[in-house]
Amino acid sequence: MTVGTLVASVLPATVFEDLAYAELYSDPPGLTPLPEEAPLIARSVAKRRNEFITVRHCARIALDQLGVPPAPILKGDKGEPCWPDGMVGSLTHCAGYRGAVVGRRDAVRSVGIDAEPHDVLPNGVLDAISLPAERADMPRTMPAALHWDRILFCAKEATYKAWFPLTKRWLGFEDAHITFETDSTGWTGRFVSRILIDGSTLSGPPLTTLRGRWSVERGLVLTAIVL
């Protein structure tokens, strides 16, 4: 079992003492869900069960780093993960990757992470998930070797995951305009999600601009927003 560090490249160093992460690149044999979690996957196919179990295993590894004992990670009304008291976090999984980032609520408002295969989006998906301005800008700001459409999709997903716990409201793909910067390596960078709808939150300041990082490595795109 290999616990990797890919997601560390997209996390801010300034709050690392209040953040923890864990990631795996395969599903270790023998893992089982906690009893409270088992009903959530009772009718799931094997692939879905493995994703569910492994990503929650990652979450418990990360929580343990912050001194939180093992706890079930259930789902809210919209499918969002429900974290132990005093904690926030985000889960993601795709082919060849499962990852979790957690943080202490008194230091971190919200976390959104996403992982995707670094490959072109299926036909028709780009128009559905992007704004015309994004489709015009990204080819000019990304190196030709990068699948910028997938990076954009990954950033949109991270934006939603950071948004929803604070608002409990839907955020459509068209409701955030994302711009990107590329670092000197060409394989990492930053992005800014400008929210185009009412950003009022359940408590605290509204969400108007969310800032994150992206990285392409080992055939994967990773994005993260930490608020």
UniProtKB/Swiss-Prot annotation:
Transfers the 4'-phosphopantetheine moiety from coenzyme A to a Ser of acyl-carrier-protein. Involved in post-translational modification of various type-I polyketide synthases required for the formation of both mycolic acids and lipid virulence factors. Acts on Pks13, Mas, PpsA, PpsB, PpsC and PpsD. Also acts on AcpM, the meromycolate extension acyl carrier protein. In addition, is involved in the activation of the acyl carrier protein MbtL and the nonribosomal peptides synthases MbtB and MbtE, which are involved in the biosynthesis of the siderophore mycobactin. Required for the replication and survival of Mycobacterium during the acute and chronic phases of infection in mice. It comes from the Bacteria. The keyword Metal-binding applies. Its EC number is 2.7.8.7. One of its GO terms (biological process) is siderophore metabolic process. The keyword Metal-binding applies. Keywords: Magnesium, Metal-binding, Transferase. It holds the Pfam family 4PPT_N. It comes from Mycobacterium tuberculosis (strain ATCC 25618 / H37Rv). This is 4'-phosphopantetheinyl transferase PptT. Identified as a drug target. It catalyses: apo-[ACP] + CoA = holo-[ACP] + adenosine 3',5'-bisphosphate + H(+).
